[in-house]
Protein backbone atom coordinates (compact mmCIF):
# COMPACT_ATOMS: atom_id res chain seq x y z
CA UNK A 1 0.00 0.00 0.00
CA UNK A 2 1.29 3.42 -0.99
CA UNK A 3 -0.23 6.33 0.95
CA UNK A 4 0.52 9.86 -0.18
CA UNK A 5 -0.35 12.84 1.95
CA UNK A 6 0.37 15.75 -0.34
CA UNK A 7 -2.00 18.59 -1.25
CA UNK A 8 -3.05 18.66 -4.90
CA UNK A 9 -3.86 22.38 -4.94
CA UNK A 10 -1.00 24.89 -4.76
CA UNK A 11 -2.83 27.78 -3.01
CA UNK A 12 -4.94 26.63 -0.06
CA UNK A 13 -6.06 29.67 1.82
CA UNK A 14 -8.40 31.14 4.35
CA UNK A 15 -9.74 34.70 4.12
CA UNK A 16 -10.35 36.13 7.58
CA UNK A 17 -12.24 39.41 7.98
CA UNK A 18 -11.26 40.85 11.34
CA UNK A 19 -13.32 44.05 10.99
CA UNK A 20 -16.72 42.70 12.02
CA UNK A 21 -17.40 42.30 15.71
CA UNK A 22 -14.60 41.89 18.22
CA UNK A 23 -11.01 42.35 17.13
CA UNK A 24 -9.24 39.01 17.58
CA UNK A 25 -6.41 38.61 20.05
CA UNK A 26 -2.99 37.38 19.02
CA UNK A 27 -3.67 34.18 20.95
CA UNK A 28 -6.79 33.56 18.86
CA UNK A 29 -4.96 34.31 15.60
CA UNK A 30 -2.10 31.96 16.49
CA UNK A 31 -4.55 29.17 17.31
CA UNK A 32 -6.20 29.79 13.94
CA UNK A 33 -2.81 29.52 12.22
CA UNK A 34 -2.09 26.27 14.06
CA UNK A 35 -5.43 24.81 12.89
CA UNK A 36 -4.71 25.96 9.35
CA UNK A 37 -1.30 24.27 9.43
CA UNK A 38 -2.88 21.04 10.66
CA UNK A 39 -5.18 21.08 7.62
CA UNK A 40 -2.28 21.96 5.29
CA UNK A 41 -3.60 25.39 4.38
CA UNK A 42 -0.77 27.62 3.20
CA UNK A 43 -2.22 31.13 2.90
CA UNK A 44 -4.02 33.38 5.36
CA UNK A 45 -5.46 36.64 4.07
CA UNK A 46 -6.10 38.94 6.99
CA UNK A 47 -8.64 41.61 6.03
CA UNK A 48 -8.47 44.82 8.04
CA UNK A 49 -10.04 48.26 8.11
CA UNK A 50 -10.17 50.11 11.46
CA UNK A 51 -8.77 47.04 13.22
CA UNK A 52 -5.17 47.99 12.43
CA UNK A 53 -3.32 50.79 14.21
CA UNK A 54 -2.42 53.00 11.27
CA UNK A 55 -0.13 55.72 12.64
CA UNK A 56 -1.58 58.44 10.40
CA UNK A 57 -5.20 57.46 11.01
CA UNK A 58 -5.78 57.60 14.77
CA UNK A 59 -9.23 59.13 14.18
CA UNK A 60 -10.23 55.83 12.58
CA UNK A 61 -9.25 53.38 15.31
CA UNK A 62 -9.26 55.50 18.46
CA UNK A 63 -12.42 53.83 19.83
CA UNK A 64 -11.05 50.32 19.22
CA UNK A 65 -8.11 48.19 20.35
CA UNK A 66 -6.50 47.53 16.98
CA UNK A 67 -3.74 45.13 16.06
CA UNK A 68 -0.39 46.90 16.03
CA UNK A 69 2.46 46.77 13.51
CA UNK A 70 4.35 44.65 16.06
CA UNK A 71 1.42 42.21 16.19
CA UNK A 72 1.48 41.83 12.41
CA UNK A 73 5.25 41.28 12.34
CA UNK A 74 4.90 38.64 15.06
CA UNK A 75 2.00 36.93 13.29
CA UNK A 76 3.84 36.96 9.96
CA UNK A 77 6.83 35.22 11.58
CA UNK A 78 4.51 32.74 13.33
CA UNK A 79 2.83 31.92 10.03
CA UNK A 80 6.14 31.46 8.20
CA UNK A 81 7.30 28.90 10.78
CA UNK A 82 4.16 26.92 9.92
CA UNK A 83 4.60 27.29 6.15
CA UNK A 84 1.70 29.71 5.87
CA UNK A 85 1.94 32.93 3.89
CA UNK A 86 0.24 35.85 5.67
CA UNK A 87 -1.27 38.03 2.94
CA UNK A 88 -2.27 41.64 3.65
CA UNK A 89 -5.78 42.66 2.69
CA UNK A 90 -7.09 46.18 3.27
CA UNK A 91 -9.86 48.34 1.86
CA UNK A 92 -8.48 50.92 -0.58
CA UNK A 93 -11.54 52.08 -2.56
CA UNK A 94 -14.82 50.98 -1.00
CA UNK A 95 -15.45 49.81 2.58
CA UNK A 96 -13.89 52.99 3.96
CA UNK A 97 -16.84 53.81 6.20
CA UNK A 98 -14.85 54.66 9.34
CA UNK A 99 -12.14 56.55 7.43
CA UNK A 100 -14.65 58.65 5.50
CA UNK A 101 -16.54 59.60 8.68
CA UNK A 102 -13.53 61.36 10.19
CA UNK A 103 -13.07 65.13 10.10
CA UNK A 104 -9.79 64.70 8.28
CA UNK A 105 -11.06 62.52 5.43
CA UNK A 106 -14.84 63.08 5.11
CA UNK A 107 -14.25 65.39 2.13
CA UNK A 108 -12.95 62.35 0.19
CA UNK A 109 -16.29 60.52 0.27
CA UNK A 110 -17.98 60.07 -3.11
CA UNK A 111 -21.27 61.25 -1.61
CA UNK A 112 -21.04 64.69 0.04
CA UNK A 113 -22.04 65.41 3.64
CA UNK A 114 -22.41 61.76 4.64
CA UNK A 115 -20.16 61.67 7.71
CA UNK A 116 -23.12 61.82 10.10
CA UNK A 117 -25.24 59.24 8.29
CA UNK A 118 -25.78 56.11 10.38
CA UNK A 119 -24.21 52.88 9.26
CA UNK A 120 -26.94 50.28 9.38
CA UNK A 121 -28.18 47.17 7.66
CA UNK A 122 -30.37 48.89 5.05
CA UNK A 123 -27.84 51.55 4.03
CA UNK A 124 -24.71 49.52 4.69
CA UNK A 125 -23.59 49.77 1.08
CA UNK A 126 -23.75 53.56 0.97
CA UNK A 127 -21.31 56.31 1.83
CA UNK A 128 -18.06 54.42 2.05
CA UNK A 129 -16.52 54.86 -1.42
CA UNK A 130 -13.60 57.16 -2.20
CA UNK A 131 -14.16 60.09 -4.55
CA UNK A 132 -12.05 59.16 -7.59
CA UNK A 133 -12.25 62.72 -8.92
CA UNK A 134 -10.14 64.00 -6.01
CA UNK A 135 -6.36 63.33 -6.27
CA UNK A 136 -6.21 63.22 -2.46
CA UNK A 137 -8.15 59.94 -2.61
CA UNK A 138 -5.25 58.23 -4.36
CA UNK A 139 -2.88 59.67 -1.76
CA UNK A 140 -5.07 58.25 1.01
CA UNK A 141 -5.08 54.77 -0.54
CA UNK A 142 -1.33 54.96 -1.15
CA UNK A 143 -0.75 56.02 2.45
CA UNK A 144 -2.70 53.01 3.76
CA UNK A 145 -0.76 50.64 1.51
CA UNK A 146 2.63 52.22 2.26
CA UNK A 147 2.16 51.77 5.99
CA UNK A 148 0.64 48.28 5.90
CA UNK A 149 2.45 46.40 3.14
CA UNK A 150 6.02 46.46 4.56
CA UNK A 151 4.88 44.47 7.61
CA UNK A 152 4.31 41.36 5.51
CA UNK A 153 6.78 39.06 3.77
CA UNK A 154 4.15 37.90 1.28
CA UNK A 155 4.61 38.53 -2.42
CA UNK A 156 0.84 39.12 -2.64
CA UNK A 157 -1.29 42.07 -1.55
CA UNK A 158 -5.09 42.35 -1.78
CA UNK A 159 -6.21 45.98 -2.26
CA UNK A 160 -9.90 45.08 -1.90
CA UNK A 161 -11.24 47.52 -4.48
CA UNK A 162 -14.70 45.95 -4.29
CA UNK A 163 -18.20 47.09 -3.36
CA UNK A 164 -17.86 50.68 -4.55
CA UNK A 165 -21.63 51.06 -4.74
CA UNK A 166 -21.53 54.88 -4.61
CA UNK A 167 -19.10 55.22 -7.52
CA UNK A 168 -20.38 57.71 -10.10
CA UNK A 169 -23.38 58.69 -7.95
CA UNK A 170 -21.85 61.76 -6.37
CA UNK A 171 -18.75 63.86 -6.91
CA UNK A 172 -17.38 61.67 -9.72
CA UNK A 173 -20.66 61.52 -11.67
CA UNK A 174 -19.29 63.80 -14.38
CA UNK A 175 -16.27 61.64 -15.17
Residue ranges and their predicted role:
Residues 1-175:
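Feature activates predominantly on carbohydrate-active enzymes
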Amino acid sequence: TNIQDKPQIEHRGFYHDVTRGRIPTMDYLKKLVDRMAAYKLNQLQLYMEHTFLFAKFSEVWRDDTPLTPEDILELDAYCRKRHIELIPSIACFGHLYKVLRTRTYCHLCELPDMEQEPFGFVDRMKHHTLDVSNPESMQLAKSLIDEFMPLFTSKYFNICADETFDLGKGKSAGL
